[in-house]
């Protein structure tokens, strides 16, 4: 039966919609979608006749167009029969002036423009290289004569004449900001040409379109910033003061600074940037003075946004600040934030990745009113970011950005930008044989053949890792199931534990249950516990953090627990993530029995581990795998359901598993046809996986030794023969030891030894049997009456999912 949405679900959905309501485009008749124009004239836009009638426009009217980033331009409107009602046709020049693309939405309204007295235009430098003759006579006069073209300050227009295309920029108009160039308008063109770089910089200003994966946060910021700056009367009408400050916090690379720049560009507000450390000065009182000047500048140019980057550098907690300067700066910032005139139209945005190190007084209401967490994006957010970064890239047909987004767990915006860059560089490397560094130019054919492929992205993903985990030893291992011989039941159990929640989350949602997130491997040393953890992390494409128990312990009080917290925080940031505790018994010993433990550090560490495993913090997709060969000394609280609830015994391999281990170890090794691996497996009873691998390594070493000795002998014989002038035989040039033979294994078996004694095995068996008995009902529990026919119970025991005997070594 499908689950019925509850009243609570409906309420949550409504709240979500309200939270992002500000982002929804309001439908208005004058908002139209941009389409490609058939007309190449820079001053013309086309509408359907019906739309012109609806908006009260006539053919030849001047209109003002508003695009992205508060950009405006003016044009003449014409009717076109082939233009749909909801579209507006314009050429590339007009689109660039509006900072818009095909498919974007622009608004159009009638404009009452005056004839201009003066217009000042300047050419772009790279379009007039090598030009001789008068620019005015050749280009500008024919372009403007009798055309009555409307122009807007800041616009760029192109003029074609004398087999050349020249770009001009409108620097100034009188009256400003737009006018019509009439026959008596004076056109000035004196001055240095405008540099292309400066123009490109202006074109590449960031806007809301360049932000991905922060939809909800962007809605909050627009509420807090755009509403007070654009419509302060809203707050006045409802009787509250508009917010003054926003604190953006989150890991490095999530886009905090980018958001602030985009808001400034889109609102058209004055933007003043303070980089935290820059205002510090060695002169007494100068640092505070710099802050005061910044606030005064913003108030003078309101509406304004004051952005303080890395605020933790200038506003640390006063009780922890070492110098007097920091304390004075914090006090100055507090008074300035309070002293901002209520309707001064100045919003302060601050960014930090260490919100807890900022002075508490700054974080109260009335200073930084709202704290917005710019977190690590999910798969949908990552796809948005990838689309933004690849919009100007040439991509091959096989590139599946959705798949790339799904596999880049834990990546922030900066990591994804680096990934795209690395993939593009790899594509260039592949074409390197066609490129000569000494040449001044590169063939157009080579340039056209460049396209980033999925293979390039795969290569880049192999090299990149989430920045949140750079300092932790995080690797996606390259161990696969084929590297592990035997243990089929254990593999299945692990797949259900880790792969299912990552790959089929909807199934858990359907049955309304949280997946189990912890597993403990126990068993004799050398049976593949660590190898299994690596394989599962690789198979489900999760990040993998390996923690060696003793590494967490330090001599400083409280530092060991902080290390545990940091590790779990990093794992949560890079979810889905497998946290692997090797030698768990070193940090999870039963509490209260630590003899000679200074200050009870080991007990505090285990307490921290327990709260992190099953604490108040939502674990997200963090899976904990512990491995130990001393399960008897581990604290029972760690092994309860909800923490490490799946206890899996990794026994010594049976005969079939030993054969699999031999095959896995020797799968890349040339073997002679008469080598009987079945016989080897039959005669290595009681050997662990590590012991069997060691036998293979020793046989390989013996083969290498024999090969080198024979080569030296043959080389000597060859030299003797050539000295006597005799010819070399064909067979003497062949490889002396082409494969590993029975003799090598017979020799290796002389040195083979068991690393696990019968006594050790008995201990593990007893522990496993104790667990079996503590399971209570075993296979005897049944409901009264007939069992439902929907399916038989799977796997009687909870350990390895097979028969009871599978749990133990026979």
Swiss-Prot record:
Which is a Gene Ontology cellular component entry for this protein? cytosol
Primary location group = cytoplasm
Q: Where is this region: Disordered?
A: 713-732, 777-810
Stated consequence of mutating residue 529 to A:
Loss of catalytic activity without affecting oligomerization
Q: What happens when the gene is disrupted?
A: RNAi-mediated knockdown causes embryonic lethality in 30-50 percent of embryos. RNAi-mediated knockdown prevents ubxn-2 nuclear localization in the 2-cell embryo. RNAi-mediated knockdown in an unc-45 (m94) mutant background, does not restore motility. Simultaneous RNAi-mediated knockdown of cdc-48.1 causes embryonic lethality. Defects in oocyte meiosis I progression. Defects in embryo S phase DNA replication causing delays in cell cycle progression. At the end of mitosis, impairs chromatin decondensation and nuclear envelope re-assembly.
SMART domains the record matches: AAA, CDC48_2, CDC48_N
Which biological process terms from the Gene Ontology are attached to this UniProt entry? autophagosome maturation; embryo development ending in birth or egg hatching; ERAD pathway; IRE1-mediated unfolded protein response; mitotic spindle disassembly; negative regulation of protein localization to centrosome; proteasome-mediated ubiquitin-dependent protein catabolic process; protein localization to nucleus
Which residue ranges does the record annotate as region Interaction with ufd-2? 805-810
Its induction, per UniProt? Induced upon ER stress. Repressed by starvation and oxidative stress.
Amino acid composition bias (Basic and acidic residues), ranges on this chain? 713-727
Q: Which InterPro entries does the entry link to?
A: AAA+_ATPase (IPR003593), AAA_ATPase_CDC48 (IPR005938), AAA_ATPase_domain (IPR050168), AAA_lid_3 (IPR041569), Asp_de-COase-like_dom_sf (IPR009010), ATPase_AAA_core (IPR003959), ATPase_AAA_CS (IPR003960), Cdc48_dom2 (IPR004201)
Regarding tissue, the record states: Expressed in body wall muscles.
Matching NCBIfam families: CDC48 (TIGR01243)
UniProt function note: ATP-dependent chaperone which probably uses the energy provided by ATP hydrolysis to generate mechanical force to unfold substrate proteins, disassemble protein complexes, and disaggregate protein aggregates. However, able to prevent aggregation of unfolded proteins also in an ATP-independent manner. Targets polyubiquitinated proteins for proteasomal degradation by binding to 'Lys-48'-linked polyubiquitin chains. Involved in the cytoplasmic elimination of misfolded proteins exported from the ER.
Q: Which family does it belong to?
A: Belongs to the AAA ATPase family. CDC48 subfamily.
Protein name (Swiss-Prot/TrEMBL): Transitional endoplasmic reticulum ATPase homolog 2
Q: Which organism is it from?
A: Caenorhabditis elegans
- Gene that encodes the chain: cdc-48.2
């Amino acid at each position: 039966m499908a689950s019925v949405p509850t009243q609570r679900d409906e309420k949550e959905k409504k709240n979500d919609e309200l939270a992002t309501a500000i982002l929804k485009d309001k439908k208005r008749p004058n908002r139209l979608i941009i389409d490609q124009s058939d007309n190449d004239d820079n001053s013309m836009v086309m509408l359907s006749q019906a739309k012109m009638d609806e908006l009260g426009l006539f053919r030849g009217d001047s209109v003002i167009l508003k695009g992205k980033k508060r950009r405006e331009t003016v044009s003449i409107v014409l009717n076109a029969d082939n233009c749909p009602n909801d579209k507006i046709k314009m050429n590339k020049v007009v689109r660039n002036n509006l900072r818009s693309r095909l498919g974007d939405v622009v608004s159009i309204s009638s404009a009452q423009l005056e004839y201009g007295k003066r217009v000042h235009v300047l050419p772009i430098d790279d379009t007039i290289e090598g030009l001789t003759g008068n620019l005015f006579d050749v280009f500008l006069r024919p372009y403007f004569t009798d055309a009555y073209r409307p122009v807007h300050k800041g616009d760029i227009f192109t003029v074609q004449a004398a087999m050349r295309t020249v770009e001009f920029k409108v620097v100034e108009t009188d009256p400003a900001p737009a006018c019509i160039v009439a026959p008596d308008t004076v056109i000035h063109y004196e001055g240095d040409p405008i540099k292309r770089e400066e123009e490109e910089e202006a074109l590449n200003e960031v806007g809301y379109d360049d932000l991905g994966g922060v939809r909800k946060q962007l809605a909050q910021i627009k509420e807090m910033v755009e509403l007070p700056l654009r419509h302060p009367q809203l707050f006045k009408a409802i009787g509250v003061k508009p917010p003054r400050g926003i604190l953006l916090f989150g890991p490095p690379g999530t886009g905090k600074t980018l958001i602030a720049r985009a808001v400034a560009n889109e609102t058209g507000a004055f933007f003043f940037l303070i980089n935290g450390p820059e205002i510090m000065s060695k002169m007494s009182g100068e640092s505070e003075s710099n802050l005061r000047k910044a606030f005064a500048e913003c108030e003078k140019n309101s509406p304004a946004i004051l952005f303080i980057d890395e605020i933790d550098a200038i506003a640390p907690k006063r009780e922890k600040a070492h110098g007097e300067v920091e304390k004075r700066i914090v006090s100055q910032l507090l008074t300035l934030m309070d002293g901002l005139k209520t309707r001064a139209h100045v919003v302060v945005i601050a960014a930090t990745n260490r919100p807890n190190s900022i002075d508490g007084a700054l974080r109260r209401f009335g200073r930084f009113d709202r704290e917005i967490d710019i977190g690590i994006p999910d798969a949908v957010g990552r796809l948005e970011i990838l689309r933004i970064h690849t919009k100007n890239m040439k991509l091959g047909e096989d590139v599946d950005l959705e798949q790339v987004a799904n596999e880049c767990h834990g990546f922030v915006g900066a990591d994804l930008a680096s990934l795209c860059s690395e993939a593009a560089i790899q594509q260039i490397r592949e074409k390197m044989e066609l490129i000569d560094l000494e040449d001044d130019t590169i063939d157009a054919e080579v340039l056209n053949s460049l396209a980033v492929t999925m293979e390039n992205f795969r290569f880049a993903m192999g090299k990149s890792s989430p920045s949140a985990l750079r300092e932790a030893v995080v690797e996606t291992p390259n161990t696969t199931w084929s590297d592990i011989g035997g243990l089929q039941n254990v593999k299945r159990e692990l797949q259900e534990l880790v792969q299912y929640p990552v790959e089929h989350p909807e199934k858990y949602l359907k049955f309304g249950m949280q997946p189990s997130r912890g597993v403990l491997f126990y068993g004799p040393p050398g049976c593949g516990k660590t190898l299994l953890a690596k394989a599962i992390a690789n198979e489900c494409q999760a990040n993998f953090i390996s923690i060696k128990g003793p590494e967490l312990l330090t001599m400083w009080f409280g530092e060991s627990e902080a290390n545990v917290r940091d590790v779990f925080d990093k794992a949560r940031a890079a979810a889905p993530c497998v946290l692997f505790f090797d030698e768990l018994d070193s940090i999870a010993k039963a509490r209260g029995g630590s003899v000679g433990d200074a200050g009870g550090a080991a007990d505090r560490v285990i307490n921290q581990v327990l709260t992190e495993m099953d604490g108040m913090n939502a674990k997200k997709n963090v899976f904990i795998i512990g491995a130990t060969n001393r399960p008897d000394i581990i604290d029972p609280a760690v092994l309860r359901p909800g923490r490490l609830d799946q206890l899996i015994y990794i026994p010594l391999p049976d005969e079939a598993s030993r054969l699999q281990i031999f095959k896995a170890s020797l799968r890349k090794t040339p073997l002679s046809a008469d080598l009987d691996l079945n016989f080897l497996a039959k005669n290595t009873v009681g050997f662990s996986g590590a012991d069997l691998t060691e036998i293979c390594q020793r046989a390989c070493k013996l083969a290498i030794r024999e090969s080198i000795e024979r080569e030296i002998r043959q080389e000597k014989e060859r030299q003797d023969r050539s000295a006597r002038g005799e010819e070399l035989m064909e067979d003497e040039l062949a490889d002396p030891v082409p494969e590993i033979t029975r003799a090598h294994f017979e020799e290796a078996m002389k040195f083979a030894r068991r690393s696990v004694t019968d006594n050790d095995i008995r201990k593990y068996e007893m522990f496993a049997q104790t667990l079996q008995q503590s399971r209570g009902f075993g296979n005897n529990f049944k409901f009264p009456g007939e069992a439902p026919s929907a399916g038989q119970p799977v796997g009687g025991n909870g350990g390895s999912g097979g028969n009871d005997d599978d749990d133990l070594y026979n």
